[in-house]
Amino acid sequence: MSASWVFVVRQEETIKMQLPEKFRRKSSAAAAMQFFYYVVLSLFSINSTGAARRPPLNGTWIRMGMLFDDKMQNDQGIPSCKALPGLSSGQKRLCQLYMDHMNAVALGANQALSECKYQFHNRRWNCSLLDDVNVFGPVITIASRETAFALALAAAGVVHSVARACRDGQLTSCGCSRMGRPKDLKRDWVWGGCGDNLEYGYKFAQSFVDVRERERKFKRGTREQGRVLMNLHNNEAGRRAVIKKAKVTCKCHGVSGSCSLITCWQQLATFREVGDYLRDKYDGATEVRVNRRGRLQIRDPRVTIPTASDLVYMEDSPNYCVKDDKIGSLGTQGRQCNRTSQDIDGCNLLCCGRGYNTLKSTIRERCQCQFKWCCQVECKTCIRSMDVHTCK
């Protein structure tokens, strides 16, 4: 009797950020497609270099994630670029060239929004989504650490989704990963299988997400130019998070567990792991400012210089304690809190010192479950009461 099982060999160090070398390993057909891809990106760069100063863009491409289920496709089942909200001119051109990629982009944005809500569900700003062009409301226009996290997570979502779509054969211009064999993989282990195409996912996300910022030209050293640099930095940090958390996974094949053959491939981490990683980066984000030469520099010289994988921000976070429509803050009134916690989810911090209300709540749940032969589980319904604490 044959047996097989999957295990992770090594995480993080195995997969390096050597993307150009990986692309050179492609077949001639894939290389030709990649050459066309780079030509397109070059055209975008040329067009944006001489662009005049443009006003802030209306909306954000991240809104695609909110429309993923109902408005993404036309009658032929192909994404309609005209129907996609918040795209810049460069993103619209990429959409027209890579229409089959837009479902993956929207899925990536969708999972980023869901992950943002999960990671911040017990914080003062809980990643509330608003039905407007900016998704998060006016708060996303503030160069805060919350904005840095949201943009990084969205960029990571595109890498993650496109890389998986390549592996699953959903896109015409890419397939399984062609990453070279890791040097530290055991000699008798076979490097193959169909791995997630991180290389392609990274490059496509870089072009699609960043072209929006590269089209915007502002006077060197201005706050507007600094915001563009901040966005580009955090976009890159998000993409690198997916690379950082990726792993080499191996499968053992053999009769009766003999493990006579081991095959290995490149695999994405779960997006929850990426979200956890970026949340830690959010907690350690570095405040920066733009200097006269048009470069970002740390505001406090005593702080360690951030790497390309770290998040940066330019403005302090607004007051999320009270409702403020001007900045898009919903406040924390009515939010459920943890009375016994001393962390940010505790009633003292989450309620901003305003106190909290306590209500008795009755919960019905299954209990005392027993297995009955054959083949069902019988349970009783138990009723219990619990205290629910909400911010005043």
Question: Which ranges hold each PLM region?
Answer:
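Classical eukaryotic N-terminal signal peptides for Sec-dependent ER targeting/secretion
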Residues: 1-41
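Long, position-biased, composition-driven segments near the start of the mature protein
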Residues: 34-36, 45-349, 353-392
